[in-house]
C-alpha cells in the first residue's frame, strides 16, 4: 500500500472501526476481491463485535499490496455514509432512517468548513501540497485520482441536493415529505443500544444453542455406545448365568454321584462286617471240630477248605479294595473338580459383579444423557422467551418512532428555530457559492484528467498486449523453472558427492601441507646439494666433451656395422647350423657326465646341500623415500613375522609375503625374498616390528639386502633391425607382455627370420616398454617409417650340469655374441640405458634383463585366460621309438622361451633351476611341456631310478607348437618272462616335485643333473598359505602288486591328510602310498623326501603325472609341470581295489599285495612306527633323507591346465588308472586323451564307467571352480605302458584323487568303449571295482549319506518347492527340488527319503498319503530326512554290467550339482561294469576286502577315547563355517594311536553333542568338561581341512549389547548396538577372546580386532550380579573394592545416584542394568546377541504407532502419494475360527471385528503394494509384528512419542485436523501410547518426538528413507 493511503487509513482507523456496522458484508466483498485469504477470514470470524472491524483494518494496513480501492468499493456498496470518514477524517453518525430525516443542524454540523473542505480536497493524492496536480503522473495515480474526484463529486452533488431541500423547507416552512425536522430523542439512542445488546445476546444464545446441539450429538453417540456396551454386558451376563446354572447342575450331579459312592461304600462296609462274622463262625466251627475230632486229615481238609474260601474272599476283597480305591480316587478328583468349579463360580460371580458395576455405570451415563437432554430443552425454552422479548422491543421501537414524528411537528412551530434557519440559510448560500467556485476548478481539472485518461487507455491497450506476451514468456519460464528444479535436485546430489570429495580433498590437503613442510626441508637440502652439483658440473662438462667424441666414434662404427649386417647374418646362419650339429654331438656326452655326477652325489647328501648356495643370489634394492612418514603400505609390500611367527617351519628369517602391483616395490622385490639387511640393520633373528622400525628409521633412501633364488636360465637381449622399405606394416602382432603373438608370413619381420612367436620385445627404437600398455606399443610399431629396431628378450634353458658352463652353453654364448656384434654397440648401450632407467635396484649376480621377467603380466601370451601360465598347444603329442633326437628340434626355437613362462604358480623348473616365482611364467610357447621335451634337459633333469629309459626324439611338426614323441618299445606286461627277477634291475625314472631320499643303485644311460635340493625352509609362493607336513599314517590300499622287492621307502610321501597342515617344527619325513598333487613352485616341492609313487591318478591327469609321480634320486632336480590350480582335497584320497586277471599271483605276491611295489629289499629301512593293523595300510619307513618338512603354499594343479609332463620318464604312467598300474584295455591301442577343462554340466556327460579304467567316484565329480582352458589332445601309443617295472609286473595301485572337487575322467567314453571292446587281451585284464563308500559321499553342499537329519522349514504361505515319489520298496523320496524354494534353502536334496513329517511317520506311507500329510498348512515344518539317492536310483536306472560290486549300493550322486536326475550317466557313477568276463570269485573277494578297508577309512567312524587328563591333547582348527577339524594330536594325548584321531579328521559328534555347526570355541569348551571317557564321531576329510587350515573358520554376526573402549592397539572398540562379524572364536588357540570385524551400516568391514568372548563376558556379568547381591545383603555396611568395579564397559547412561559415597561406589557396578543390557532369560548372553543379515530388496512396510495415527497416515498419503499407500482392509463375512485359521496359515496378518464382519489385513495386499514400489502403511495391532517376522516381512515400526496429553490436545492443522482434540480423548490416547511403548518398545525401529504434524511427517519420511537403505539385522539363534 502506498504510504499516503496507509497514513490516511491509519488516521481514520479508530473512527471507521467504531462506525462500521455491516462488517460481514464488507468481509465478503473483500474476500471475493482477493484482499483477504481464507486463513485471515477464519481469524476474523473468531473475533466478535467491533474488534472484528478493527482487526480488519489492521490486517489491511499490514499487507504489502494496495487494497485501499477494494475497501473503498466495499464500503460504497454496503455503507456509503462511511466514505467521508475514509476521505475527510470526519465523524459521521449512523445513517438516517429516511431521506431528509434529521435536523438541518446535525447535517450541517457534519460538513467541513471552507478551509477544511479545501484542505481535504487538496489532500487527496498529495497530502499537504498545492491543489494543482503534479506535472508527471503514472497511470495508476491518474486512475486513482479520477476515482477519488468522481467520488467527491457524487458526495457534493448529494449534499447539494439535500441542502436545496432544506433551503426550500426553511423558506416555505414545510419539508418536501411534509414532515418537519426534529432533534433525536435521547430515549431513541438508549432504546437503540438496548436493541443492539438484545441482538448480541440473541446471537450468543444461538451460538450456545449450536454448541448444545453438538454436545447433544456427542452425548447421543456415547449413549449409543453405552447401549451397545450394555447389551453386550447383558449378553455376557446371560451367558455367565447359563454357565453358572450348568456348573450348578454339574455340581448337583457330582453330589448325587458322591452320595451313591458313599452308599456303595457303606454297603461294602456292611458286607465286610458280615464276612468278618462269617470268618469268626468258621473259626469257631474249626475249633469245635478240633475238639471233637483230632484227626489231622480232617483238620487238613478243613484247613484247605478254609484256605480256599480265604483265597476267594481275599480275591474278592482285593477286587473290592481296588474298586474302592478307584472310586475314592474318582471321588477325590470330583471333589477337586468341585472345588475348582466353586472357585470358577466365585470368579464368575466376581466377574458378574464387575459387569453389574459396569452396567450401573452405563445407567448413570444414561441418566447423565437424559439430564443433558433436559438441559437442552430448558435452553431451547429460554431461546423462545428471548425471541418473544425481541418482538416486544421491536413494537416499542415503532411506538417511539411515531412519538418522534409528533415531536418533529411541534418543533416547526417554534419561531426561534425559524430565525436560526434563516441565519443558517445565509451561511449555506455563502458556502454554496464557495462550493460552486471550487466546482468550476474541479471541472477544469476533470477536463485535463479526461485527456490524461484517454492517453492512459491507449497505454493500457499496449500494456495488455505486452502482458499477453509476458504471460507467454512466463509460461516458458515456468517450464524452464521445472527443468531447473529437476536440475537442482540432481545438483544437490552432486553437491553432496562433491562435499564428500571435498572432505577427502581437505584431508589430502592437510597431508599435502605436511608433505610441503617436508618438501621445504628437502628443498633447503637440495639447494645445498645444488651448490655442490654446480661445482661438479664443470668437471662433468669436460667429461661430456670426451663422451661426445666417443659417441661420434661409436656412430661411425655403427654405420660400419650396419653395412656389414648382411654378411654377419650369413655367418650367423652358418654358425647356427654348426651349433645344432655340435648340440647333437655334445648331448650324449653331457648326459653321461650328468648321470655320473648324479650317481656320485647319491653317496652324500651333503654335496646337495653344499651346492645349495649356487641357487641363491644376493641383491641390493634401493627405495627412494618420498615422504618421512612412509610405511609398508606406501611401499607396496608386506613381510612375515620372523622370529615370533616364522613364515616357514624352522626358518625365522623375514620374508616378503606380498608385493602390490604398480607399487614402488613392484619390480624390485619379489614374493619370498629373504630380507637380510635394511639400512645397515641386520635382520637375522629379528621379528617384523624390528624390521619395520629399521625401515622407518632410515633417512633418505632405503637400502635393502635381499636373498632370492637365482634364475639359472640364460637370458639374452638380442637387437633386431628390420628394414620396412616403404611398407607400413611390419607384420608383427603383439599381446600383453609385450610378446610377439604372431608374425605375418611375407612381412619384413618374417623375412628377417630372427623374430619368433613368443619372443618378448623389450624396446622399440630404443624406447623401453617396461611400463607401456599394449596400445602404446602398437602405436610405436606403427609410427616407424623406414626401419624398425627391436630389442628381443630370448630365454634359453641352461644345461643341467652344475659344474659351470659346458660346451653347449659356450656355443650358445658365442651365438649370442655374434648377435650382439651384428647389431652394434650403440643399440645395445641404448637399450641398456633404457632398462636401467626403469629399474633402480642393483643386482649383483645376474644380467640386467633378469628383472624384466619379474614384472607381472596381465595374462598369458597365448590366450585370453587371466591365469599366469600358458596353455599347452592344441597339437597332439606322439611318442617315437627313436633313440636319438632329430636335428629339426634342436634349433634355438625349441629352447626358446618367453618371459611369461617364468610366471607360473611357483613352478619348479624342469632343468633344476630355482622354482619359478608366482609372478613369473614359464618361457616358451609350450611352457614347461615344450621345454621338457628336449632331451638334454628333460632326460637329464628327470633321470634316476631303475626304469628303462625311453630314448626320445621328435618327428616332423605338423602345426605350430606341436611336439611328437614316442617311447621306447617294451615288452608286454603279460609276458611271463617279465615276472622273472632280472639280474640288473631296470632303471625307473621319476619326476617328483622334490628330491627323493632314496636313490637308484645303478647309473642311468644318460647323465642326469646334479641339481641339489632346495633348502627345506623356503617357499616361493604365497598363493596357498597353508603349511603341510609330509608324514602320517596312510589309508592307501594296493592290491594285486608283484612280489615286493622294494623297500617301503620307495613309496611316495604325499601330503598326509592325517597331519596338521600348518607350520610345525620339521619332523622326520614319513612316506606313504599316495598319488597326490604337489604344490607347484612351492619352494619345498623341490626337496620333498622320497616322493616315489606306486600309482598314477587318472582322475585328473593321464600325462602330467608321468612327470611328477616317478621315483628318482634325492639329488635329482624336481620337476613340476604347470597344472591348473586345485586345492588338495584329501577327502577324495580314495584307495582303489586292483586284482590280477589271472591266477598267476604267487603267495608271495599276495602277501605283499597291500604294500607298494618297489626296489630290492636290500634298500629297505626299518619302519618309523607301526601302521594300522588293517588291510590296505602301508608300512612306514625312515627315509635316508635329512629332516625336512614339506610346506604347502601353492594351489594344487591338475593336468587339465594344459601342461604335458616331460616324456623322459616312461609314458606308461599316463595311462595308469587310479585302480592299478596294470596295462588297461584302453592303452592297448592308439587312443586320444581329451585334457580340456569342462564345465560342471559337461562332467556329467564324461563319466567313464568302462572296465578297469573306471574312475573313482571322487574322480568323476565336476567342479564349477575348475579353470577353463583350450582343448588339447595327446596321442597315446599302442605300446602297453606301465609306470614302473622292477621285478615283474606291478598291477596294484592306489588312486588318490586330489582335486578340490573331483575332476572328470579325461578319457572319451566312446573312444574307450570302442577300444576296450576291440582288444583281444581284455579278457585277461583284472577287474577293478571302485569303492563307492568314499568320502566323496558327502559333497560340500550335500548331506551325509544314510544319515538322518532334521530339516526345519519356515513355510509361511509359500509352497514347499519339492516333488515326491514313492520308492520301489516303500518310502517317500524327493524327486525334485526347485532351486531357490524354501525347501532348497532349508537343505532338502534330491534323493532325500522323508522319514517323518512334523512327527508323522512316512516310512511306510504311500505317495497319496504323503501328499495329504505334506499338504497340511502350518507355519513351521520339521522333516526327518535321510539322504538315500541310490535307493531310488537303483530302482529306476538299469546297469549294463554283468557283475556289480556289492558295495556299490552305497554309491551316491556325485554329479555336477544338479538336484534332479536329468543326466542318466550321473545317476550312479560309482557302479563299475566289466567289458570282458567277470573277475573270478577269488579275485572278487580280495577286491571286496580291499574295498571294505577303504570304506572303513573314509566313512564316518567312531573313536572312543579314555580321558585320563583334563585336556585331550588335541589341537583344533576350523569352525562353524567349514566344520571343526583336528589340527594336531600331541604325542602324549590319549587320542593318539592307530584307532584314535588323526589330523584332518572332521569332528561330527562329541559325546551326544552334534558339533557340525558349532564354533571351534564351543567344541573346545566341550572338550574341557571333565569326563572319564568320550565318544567321538569323526570323518577324515583332508581336502576341506586343507582349506580350513590357517584361515578363520568361524562366521557369524553379533550385536554388541554394551560399550567397549579398547585399551590395547590390537583390541577393537565398539559401541552398544554395533554389528560385529566374528570370524575366529579361538584365535591362535587362545581362549577368552574373539577376532571380529566392525561393520558399518552397509555391512561393510571397517576394522578388525580382538574382543572378549561370550564366556568371559558372562563370567563378568555373573561376578557383577553376585556383587550386586552382596550389596543388597549388606546394604550400606560394605563397599566393594575398586577391582570389583572394573569392567569392560563404559557407562553410557546416567543413573540416579544417591548422595552418599557408598551409594556412588555401589551404583558404579550397575553396568548391566536394564537400560543398557537385557535381563537374564534362558541363558541368553548379556554381552552379545547373535543376529542374521537380511537384504531387503523390496520396500518395507511401515507401521506407525502412537497418538493421532489416522491424521498422520492421511497426511503422508496425501503429501507423498508416490511413496506411501495405506493397506486396504478386506471385509470378510466369515466365522472367527476361519479368520483365526487364516492367521495361523499366514494368509492374514491381523483382523478387527466389526458389526457382522471382519476387517482383515492380508499378506497379499501388503505384497501388492510393495510390488508397486510403495511403502505400505499398516493398520494392525502391535502384537501382529511377530507374525510379520514369521512371514519374513520386516516392517519399519515408528513410534510417535508425546510428552504429555496437553501436547496432543494442542495439535491443530487447518486441513487434516480442523477440530480441536478434546481433553478426554487426548488423555486416553496418551495413556494408550504409554502402555504400548512399555509393552512393545523392543519392536520399535525408531521413536519420533511429537510436535507439529508437518514436522512429524518430515521425520517419518527421513527415517523411512534411512531405514530402507540400511542392512536389516534380525535376531538369530542365541549364542
Swiss-Prot record:
Topological relation to the membrane, as annotated: Peripheral membrane protein
Chain positions covered by the region annotation Disordered: 98-142, 927-1122, 1150-1187, 1201-1230, 1245-1264, 1271-1306, 1434-1493
Matches recorded under PROSITE patterns: CARD, GUANYLATE_KINASE_2, PDZ, SH3
Domain Guanylate kinase-like, residue spans: 1722-1905
Residues modified to Phosphothreonine: 984, 1011, 1183
Coiled-coil region list: 383-599
Any one of the GO BP annotations: metanephric collecting duct development
Biased composition (Low complexity): 109-123, 1252-1264, 1284-1298
Subcellular location(s) per record: Cell junction; Cell membrane; Postsynaptic density; Cytoplasm, Cytoskeleton, Cilium basal body
Compositional bias (Polar residues): 1449-1462
Keyword set includes Cell membrane: yes
Biased composition (Pro residues): 1045-1055
Cystines in this chain: none
Tissue: Highly expressed in normal breast tissues and low-grade breast cancer tissues (at protein level). Highly expressed in the placenta and prostate. Expressed at a lower level in the thyroid, spinal cord, trachea, adrenal gland, skeletal muscle, pancreas, heart, brain, liver and kidney. A short splice product shows more limited expression, being absent from at least the brain.
Modified residue annotations for Phosphoserine: 264, 295, 900, 1000, 1021, 1209, 1263, 1334, 1666
UniProtKB keywords: Cell junction, Cell membrane, Cell projection, Coiled coil, Cytoplasm, Cytoskeleton, Disease variant, Membrane, Phosphoprotein, Repeat, SH3 domain, Synapse
Domain notes: The guanylate kinase-like domain interacts with the SH3 domain.
Disease in which the protein is involved: Yuksel-Vogel-Bauer syndrome: An autosomal recessive disorder characterized by multisystemic manifestations including cystic kidneys, nephrotic syndrome, hydrocephalus, limb abnormalities, congenital heart disease and craniofacial malformations.
Function: Acts as a regulator of the Hippo signaling pathway. Negatively regulates the Hippo signaling pathway by mediating the interaction of MARK3 with STK3/4, bringing them together to promote MARK3-dependent hyperphosphorylation and inactivation of STK3 kinase activity toward LATS1. Positively regulates the Hippo signaling pathway by mediating the interaction of SCRIB with STK4/MST1 and LATS1 which is important for the activation of the Hippo signaling pathway.
The protein's name: Disks large homolog 5
